[in-house]
Amino acid sequence: MSAVIGGLVTALFILFGMSGFEDGSGDVTIREVSPPAEGESGDGAGPPVREVYTQSGPGVVSVDVASSEFGPSGGSGFVLDEQGHIVTNQHVVEGAEDVSVRFASGVREDAEIVGEDASTDVALIKVDASEGILEPLTLGDSDSVGVGEPVVAIGNPLNVGISVTTGIVSGVGRPIKAPNDYTIDDAVQTDAAINPGNSGGPLLDSRGTVIGVNAQIASESGGFEGVGFAVPINTVKSVVRQLITTGEVVHGYIGVSMFPVGIGELAAYTGLSKGQLADEYGLPENGAIVSEVASGGPAEEAGIEGGGEEEIEGIPVPTGDVVTEMEGKPISSADDVIEVVNSSKPGDRLALTVVSPGEEPRRVEVTVGVRPDDA
């Protein structure tokens, strides 16, 4: 990304650990609840915060981690089921040699890591807890969450103990960066205070159901400034199913790197009209530009090409193919491409419309592969 474009983004995205359904096996049950009926959500109605905390607080845990590389650290988590599975963030347990959890009752239990997925910042740990200790939370539907709805965040900020903060859903469908720099789609943005140690704790709606896993903030100062993000619970559901079943997560992959700025944004940044971009540089009116194609990857096999680079009003821009449509949906940015790929699975066939600069659109079909560990 050029300095011109990179300079437009000044906030830091900070991962906040703290330093210093049925899964198919027949023996694991995850509590889920249907979305509220139309008119039930978005009006601020629902149980008071104290009631939500009383209902859900016992299912939230502190996660304590020790490693020779990073020393002691920690975060939060919540009980998923009565078999002892606990959800937290991957960055909380990354590199951990010893993991333990502290329940709200004060009971401490050793935990083992079942699996981690850096691409979604989700990890699953497991405890062998005594009967009556585990109080699973109920999972909601993050796709039904609306801007303005009240939310409650519970966790262990700054290691002071399980605490509650409140706010609203400030935005939905936000793309955020995972620990491995992949994009997590559809994050829930909130102004509920999220501080070091909150990572891995639940973001709950007014009914006390989990709609996200608190993960990071955007900040220019390094402290909380009212912009926090939670991994959407629908993404978490898919990940934990795979972790429980196989201990790993498989992601779709087509083998392209995309220029972060879409054609529409490029026009705004350069001061050129879309017509000028078309006449002078052969670019279509909308789309996402391919900067690189992985050798031997699905996109290369389908005939999609990356390219060199040329300057447009001082901004270095790739000269690769432009993706204008995927699966019948218009594409306007790299995030649109990422969202389609993230929602696919290996073996799926994706129909794309691509344009090489100065040429007519063409249709290609890409067979989704398995994302390599080093991709």
Q: What are the roles of these predicted feature ranges?
A:
Residues 1-11, 15-279, 283-286, 295, ...:
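Serine-dependent protease modules
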Residues 86-87, 299-335:
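Conserved PDZ fold ligand-binding element
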Residues 267, 300-302, 309-314, 361-364, ...:
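Extended hydrophobic-aromatic, low-complexity segments
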